[in-house]
UniProtKB/Swiss-Prot annotation:
It comes from Bovine herpesvirus 1.1 (strain Cooper) (BoHV-1). It is found in: Virion membrane; Host Golgi apparatus, Host trans-Golgi network; Host endosome membrane; Host nucleus inner membrane. It holds the Pfam family Herpes_glycop. InterPro entries: Herpes_glycop_M. HAMAP family: HSV_GM (MF_04035). This is Envelope glycoprotein M.
């Protein structure tokens, strides 16, 4: 038995080593971003200042053709400087959050399991459920490739930086997919998390609701990377292949729209099996589409003469496509929240209990506010929330996952007494007052 426990212990220590390396690379990425944004750090330029729409000849720096016969070039469409810096910082923060999550998981797993082959095997299973070793490797690779792209952008080596960022797209996509699924089918994942409820409540809180939060953060991260990578493709096409300005814009926006729609569909079909409350991917897609729309509006305003010459209808089509992606993201966000509430309502889970409690508190607050102002009580559907169960502060519904339904309570009533003369006897007659004695 001791010989069987030794490989499990080796696997556990290797996972701990991977967590340490991953946390170190995530921290190094954050330090690199801070240094690349500091003027006195030694880097020549600010990495997030990728494009400049001033009227000047950029033939030496690269860019898209504006007037090929005159040698005039202009930069391709890209995000604004604060947006680029914010997206990169969010990537570093999410990777650091995953590293902190893994450290907390390692501490909890170690405290609640000690000695024996079964304990060692259970520790490895929980470690894989927290973050698979392959996901740690992909996350470290994502941090390293983004760091390389930031350094190249600081030196304004645009073609190589764009190619590096496009290569950076693959590791985060694989990392998010493997981290969210934990390498398990949806049914097995739900069963593994549910089994921790009785065996290890502390691990269940971390690997259940806590991991659901991390899945939302990771989904939002991938949405932002999907919004940045197509614009990097436009930079590569404009500077490396010498395409026109309109061609680079149309190519970048088209790739983003297709990738965003595919990502939203896969999120609803695949990732929703692992956590029902999943607004992160749709919200991240909405943010990415909005940021690209703001950047494209400024871009078309600054270079309106060139855009009208090359493609008069390009601006309207780009804005229409981005608006469609944003509306689709909003629709998918609402759909996911509605389906999540219906799912938890059907299961009678704790999440639906919290939602119902919040709704009841809001209804009580509205009722008190209206009564303090002397307003009439609500009618119709709004008044349905203000029933006895809502107005009572002492009653609190408790919802547990897969809990059996409660039997209906029958109110106790006092037995009715028939109204009759016997039940209500007449009072005794009053005695006459004593006579006065003279």
């Amino acid at each position: 038995m001791a010989g069987s426990a030794q490989p499990a212990a080796v696997h556990w220590r290797l996972w701990l080593a991977q967590v340490g390396v991953f946390a170190g690379l995530a921290l190094l990425l954050l330090i690199t971003l801070i240094g690349a944004a500091s003027p006195g750090a030694g880097l020549p330029c600010f990495y997030a200042a990728i494009v400049n729409y001033n009227a000047r000849n950029l033939s030496a720096d690269g860019g898209a053709w504006a007037q090929r016969e005159l040698g005039a070039r202009h930069p391709a469409l890209f995000l604004e400087t604060p947006t680029t810096a914010a997206f990169s910082a969010y990537t570093a923060v999410v990777l650091l959050a995953v590293a902190a999550f893994d450290v907390a998981a390692a501490i909890i797993i170690r405290r609640e399991n000690s000695g024996g082959f079964a304990a060692a095997y259970h520790m490895n299973a929980l470690a894989t459920l927290a973050t698979p070793p392959g996901a740690l490797l992909l996350g470290a690779l994502a941090a390293w490739t983004l760091q390389a792209a930031v350094l190249l952008l600081s030196h304004k080596i645009m073609v190589l930086a764009a190619a590096t960022y496009l290569a950076h797209l693959a590791p985060p996509a694989a990392f998010v997919g493997l981290f969210c699924t934990a390498g398990l089918p949806g049914a097995e994942y739900a069963q593994a998390v549910h089994a921790l409820r009785e065996r290890s409540p502390r691990a269940h809180r971390l690997l259940g609701p806590g991991r659901a939060v991390m899945i939302n953060l990771a989904g939002g991260l991938l949405a932002l990377i999907i919004g940045t990578a197509p614009l990097m493709l436009g930079q590569l096409l404009g500077a490396g292949l010498g395409l026109s300005l309109a061609q680079t814009v149309v190519a970048g926006v088209t790739v983003f729209c297709l990738a965003a729609v595919l990502f939203l569909v896969l999120t609803e079909l695949v990732l929703s099996r692992y956590t029902q409350v999943l607004p992160g991917p749709a919200f991240g897609t909405l943010v990415a589409a909005s940021c690209i729309a703001v950047a494209s509006h400024d871009y078309f305003h600054q270079l309106r003469g060139v855009v009208r010459t090359q493609a008069p209808r390009a601006a309207a089509r780009v804005k229409l496509a981005l608006a469609g992606v944003a509306l689709l993201a909003v629709a998918m966000l609402v759909l996911r929240l509605v389906r999540a509430c219906l799912h938890h309502r059907r299961k009678g889970s704790a999440f639906y209990g919290h939602v119902s409690a919040a709704r009841q508190q809001a209804a009580r607050y509205i009722a008190r506010a209206r009564s303090s102002r002397g307003m009439a009580p609500l009618e119709g559907d709004a008044a349905a929330l203000l029933d006895r169960g809502v107005a009572s502060d002492d009653e609190e519904a408790v919802y547990e996952a897969h809990a059996p339904p409660r039997p209906p309570t029958i109110p106790l009533r006092r037995p009715e007494v028939p109204h009759s003369r016997a039940s209500h006897p007449r009072p005794p007659p009053r005695s006459p007052p004593p006579a006065h004695v003279k």
